Amino acid sequence: MINKIYGKIVDKKESSIIILAFPFEFEILVSSFCKMELRLLEDVEILTYFHFRDDDVKLFGFLNISEREVFEDLIGVDGIGPKAALKILSGIKYDAFRLAIAKEDINLISKVKGIGNKIAGKIFLKLRGKLVKGDESSSYMLKFKELEQSIVNMGFDRKLVVVAFREIMLSDKFLILKEAEQEQFLFTETLKRLSV
């Protein structure tokens, strides 16, 4: 199995990237969120999932272990193959997906293009016990702990800040942002809500 590839991104296609790991070039299928985080000619480390069947050999790539784990959990659901799992992770970020499972928000999952209520229900039933090891929303919120403290230091109640964070993080606007843009958006939207 190919676990990880180090190399330079030499091309970005609609649903994949090309990495030069001298002397080889690898085409790696990635989610739209993963692709947005990567830049041409950037040296990267991509975690991979090697998919091999008699008539199909593909490499799927991920920025971190958590994204790959969610992908592997998804392909463990009956009727969801690697391409469908990647499509799901292109419609909802892996951390937001985990949060939706933890919060039993089937509607958020069913909003992903090509995923209806039936498949969303199947995913939820299969993964709710597997992905929810404690409070996933808490681990998701750790990314923004400093921001939370900054807003509390401005005189706002911590409980209200946490409630606002959770609501904003599940919004469509937040979920389509690049990771680098999420903190600023979360800060601005939280202040708008709390200042009313």
UniProtKB/Swiss-Prot annotation:
Assigned keywords, A-Z: Cytoplasm, DNA damage, DNA recombination, DNA repair, DNA-binding
SMART domains documented for this protein: HhH1 (SM00278)
Listed GO MF terms: ATP binding; four-way junction DNA binding; four-way junction helicase activity
InterPro entries: DNA_helicase_Holl-junc_RuvA_I, Hlx-hairpin-Hlx_DNA-bd_motif, NA-bd_OB-fold, RuvA, RuvA_2-like
Region ranges (Flexible linker): 143
GO biological process: DNA recombination; DNA repair
Renumbered residue ranges of the record's region Domain III: 143-196
Pfam family, one: RuvA_N
Organism domain of life: Bacteria
Region spans: Domain I: 1-63
GO CC, alphabetical: cytoplasm; Holliday junction resolvase complex
Cell compartments where the protein resides: Cytoplasm
Residue ranges, annotated region (Domain II): 64-142
Predominant place of localization: cytoplasm
Family to which the UniProt record says this protein belongs: Belongs to the RuvA family.
Entry function: The RuvA-RuvB-RuvC complex processes Holliday junction (HJ) DNA during genetic recombination and DNA repair, while the RuvA-RuvB complex plays an important role in the rescue of blocked DNA replication forks via replication fork reversal (RFR). RuvA specifically binds to HJ cruciform DNA, conferring on it an open structure. The RuvB hexamer acts as an ATP-dependent pump, pulling dsDNA into and through the RuvAB complex. HJ branch migration allows RuvC to scan DNA until it finds its consensus sequence, where it cleaves and resolves the cruciform DNA.
Entry remark concerning the domains of this protein: Has three domains with a flexible linker between the domains II and III and assumes an 'L' shape. Domain III is highly mobile and contacts RuvB.
Oligomeric form and interacting partners: Homotetramer. Forms an RuvA(8)-RuvB(12)-Holliday junction (HJ) complex. HJ DNA is sandwiched between 2 RuvA tetramers; dsDNA enters through RuvA and exits via RuvB. An RuvB hexamer assembles on each DNA strand where it exits the tetramer. Each RuvB hexamer is contacted by two RuvA subunits (via domain III) on 2 adjacent RuvB subunits; this complex drives branch migration. In the full resolvosome a probable DNA-RuvA(4)-RuvB(12)-RuvC(2) complex forms which resolves the HJ.
Protein name per the record: Holliday junction branch migration complex subunit RuvA
Species this protein is from: Borrelia duttonii (strain Ly)
Gene: ruvA
